[in-house]
Amino acid sequence: MTADEDRIVDLLRRLDPEPVRPVRVDLTAAVHEARRRRRSRRTMSVSAAGLAVLAAVSVPLVVGGGPSAGPASQPASPSTSGSAPATIAPPATTAPGGPTACTAQPLPVPGGHAKSLVTGGDPTGRFLAGRSYPGDGRGNPVILWDGDRAREYRLPGSDQRMVDVNAAGVAVGSVYLDDRPQPYVIRNGRPARLPGLASGEATAVSADGRIVGARQIGDRQRPVLWSDPDTAAVELPLPGPRWEGTAIGVDSAGTVVGKIHDGPSGVTRTAVWRAGGGGPELLPTPSVEGGPASEFVAHSLRGGWITGVAFRDEGKVRRIYPARYHLATGRYEPLPSGVSPSAGNGRGWVVGPVDRMDAGLLTDAGTLRLPDLDGRTGRYAAVAVSVSDDAAVIGGQLDVEPGQKSLVMRAIRWSCR
């Protein structure tokens, strides 16, 4: 692989799941043009031309952070306007915990298709959501795994994906139909379009069936909430008329977390909507090594923990500081350098790429690299996208033919102990 190819593949690891672009890390905070393309769904299929364009608009990314990233601890005070950066607190003192070993197992794929992905998982580890790539021109069959049992769903349109699932097996996501994204739910074994949106997507579902996502209006998005799968979506209030964005997490207490920005060129802010209504609280950005972060982009909400990445711009270099935010205490905590969280669990543990080579699990005990099918680590294109609250089950994918010119991604469950 050439240096240019390596750079492109590394960039694609940070985009939404496809067989040739394994992991989803939101580049909207780094490249607003990439946000515009994703919203218009022009990145839903990758071509050689698309790779060149994406590489051209990218900026240098340098991973920073780690336990020494922040000064002395200080709680973060949410606000609805600009605020001083919040200092990242040292990691909480807790007893060491978490798995010390994992094994990888391919998930069964109906039809035996060579390429498949995991796109989400539930907090208990029982359910995983994903999709396969039959290449028959009918889009991507959605798969729900209940343990080792796999069920395939043929949804209308193309680019079908379920991105989250709860402990009851309710899965949410979207399809691309009639030249626009449309939100979908699978409940009790039956797929259905979510009501109230002409165009949009569902991004997360709570234990009690609340669903969040975004309404699509041209190139803009506005965060929405479905109180249940049968009730029409309602837009969540924003700080002003130019603001836009999407909700990315919801819990059974009614707390919603989202990523919003003031106009197409505004910096990304993490927003929190509490139960009972009212405008969003805008979390301050953390202080990181070298000064205040430019942005903090949330990726997931689970058990009161928001996991994501902070960015600090230093000239033409954008530095990345993985971090998590605890809603109950109002504190940021740094995550070790080299870990880029793609999902978190109810204990604040995260999974994601490690040092551009492996997928990893970060717990209070440290970082555990996830093995390949033969128990090794260090081969490119291992991707983790979901982690159960006890970290016993991690969903993701592996390149099962490493060293070849093209990636052959296969849906994987890591069982950890």
Regions found by a protein language model. Name each.
Residues M1-S83:
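N-terminal export/targeting signals for secretion/compartment entry
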Residues L15, S40-T43, S58-R417:
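Residue-level hotspots at or immediately adjacent to binding/recognition sites across diverse folds
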